[in-house]
Amino acid sequence: MGKVHGSLARAGKVKSQTPKVEKQEKPKQPKGRAYKRLLYVRRFVNVTNMVGGKRRMNPSS
């Protein structure tokens, strides 16, 4: 058997420490063809270019 990193007594420590956040109610995502259309619009129609004309998948900054 392989070596285990740390004792199994500490298993799940981080998960038990994180505060529980309730799921939020969101509008439903389109399915199938409509979802593909949404992706197309997001990627190619509302183009957000970076410096040098590059596109980024997650242009938050």
From Swiss-Prot:
Annotated signal sequence range: none
Record protein name field: Small ribosomal subunit protein eS30A
GO molecular function: structural constituent of ribosome
Compartment(s) where it occurs, according to its Swiss-Prot or TrEMBL record: Cytoplasm; Nucleus
Annotated spans, Disordered: 1-36
Gene: rps3001
Family: Belongs to the eukaryotic ribosomal protein eS30 family.
Gene Ontology CC, one term: nucleus
Further information: There are 2 genes for eS30 in S.pombe.
Reported function: Component of the ribosome, a large ribonucleoprotein complex responsible for the synthesis of proteins in the cell. The small ribosomal subunit (SSU) binds messenger RNAs (mRNAs) and translates the encoded message by selecting cognate aminoacyl-transfer RNA (tRNA) molecules. The large subunit (LSU) contains the ribosomal catalytic site termed the peptidyl transferase center (PTC), which catalyzes the formation of peptide bonds, thereby polymerizing the amino acids delivered by tRNAs into a polypeptide chain.
